[in-house]
Amino acid sequence: MQTSLLKPKIIAVESLGENHAKVVMEPFERGYGHTLGNALRRVLLSSMVGYAPTEVTIAGVVHEYSTLDGVQEDVVNLLLNLKGVVFKLHNRDEVTVTLRKEGEGVVTAGDIELAHDCEVINPDHVIAHLSKGGKLDVQIKVEKGRGYVPGNVRRYGEDTAKIIGRIVLDASFSPVRRVSYAVESARVEQRTDLDKLVMNIETTGVITPEEAIRQSARILVDQLSVFAALEGTETAAEAPSRAPQIDPILLRPVDDLELTVRSANCLKAENIYYIGDLIQRTENELLKTPNLGRKSLNEIKEVLASRGLTLGMKLENWPPAGLDK
């Protein structure tokens, strides 16, 4: 009887557009499609290294709830637009860039003054609209990081210096926008109970979907190599206990789910501000929310399912220390 496990012999990459690809791998032993697909998806969404704006200083602005004369957007929307700029740094971990523009017109990411080792992937991204006499002067700090780091976590980190006008941003470093996977049937000779793993990956353009798969696989291999090197349980028994790690996805605000305005407002009315708050609610609890009907509930369930989450989940140590409410 053959005891060795099958390894994929076919790996195909199909481009579905700019920074969007479908990766097909087969054959796998039955069950391994879901085992590896889910592991890769979670690593791709939470653990990839990328770059993001982390701090912003705007001339004439003290806090994010301000407005600027001659600028169509208020500061909150201006910050959201700045977070949409995709940066890529070469051989450095952080940089501060400048955005200056005067006069009527559209301000785009291409107007940012860049250092020689800093690149903007989406220069056509719109940041603001200036009217006649309008002026914008912004300092943007861009850093290298991993996953998603809320601004309140960074704000209470090691750097406690208070600088008037400095606005700390929630930083989504991940170069991966969306990931989904499906497991289909595969056949090898007379065996028809095998798996074919199909992964659909969209990135920001900082890395290609193929490179994203490679990096996520390396992360998994590196983590699992610890188990392969086990020689006994004595060391593990002496290791200090750690509090359970919280998935960075759960620290994201519910606004990142891109729900309809009606659904988002209903959740906020119930003090549900983070995805971690939402997944702990049951369907019955949400249906008791004023103005939230079955249609909105189905929308919430579908959006959560696309990220591998469901309602009614249990979380330990929630909310984490330092999380704003």
Swiss-Prot record:
Q: Which UniProt keywords apply?
A: DNA-directed RNA polymerase, Nucleotidyltransferase, Transcription, Transferase
Indicate the quaternary assembly. Answer: Homodimer. The RNAP catalytic core consists of 2 alpha, 1 beta, 1 beta' and 1 omega subunit. When a sigma factor is associated with the core the holoenzyme is formed, which can initiate transcription.
- List the protein's name: DNA-directed RNA polymerase subunit alpha
GO terms (BP aspect): DNA-templated transcription
Under catalytic activity, the entry for this protein gives: RNA(n) + a ribonucleoside 5'-triphosphate = RNA(n+1) + diphosphate
Q: Enumerate the GO terms in the molecular function aspect.
A: DNA binding; DNA-directed RNA polymerase activity; protein dimerization activity
Pfam families associated with the record: RNA_pol_A_bac (PF01000), RNA_pol_A_CTD (PF03118), RNA_pol_L (PF01193)
Return the annotated region ranges for Alpha N-terminal domain (alpha-NTD): 1-231
Q: Which GO terms describe its cellular component?
A: cytoplasm; DNA-directed RNA polymerase complex
Biological role stated in the UniProt entry: DNA-dependent RNA polymerase catalyzes the transcription of DNA into RNA using the four ribonucleoside triphosphates as substrates.
The root-end lineage is: Bacteria, Pseudomonadati, Pseudomonadota, Betaproteobacteria, Burkholderiales
Q: What organism is recorded for this protein?
A: Burkholderia multivorans (strain ATCC 17616 / 249)
Domain commentary = The N-terminal domain is essential for RNAP assembly and basal transcription, whereas the C-terminal domain is involved in interaction with transcriptional regulators and with upstream promoter elements.
Give start-end ranges for the coiled-coil region(s).
none
The entry sums up its family as follows: Belongs to the RNA polymerase alpha chain family.
Specify the domain of life of the species encoding this protein: Bacteria
Spell out the residue ranges making up region: Alpha C-terminal domain (alpha-CTD): 246-325
Q: What NCBIfam families does the record tag this protein with? A: PRK05182.1-2 (NF003513), PRK05182.2-5 (NF003519), rpoA (TIGR02027)
Q: What is its EC number?
A: 2.7.7.6
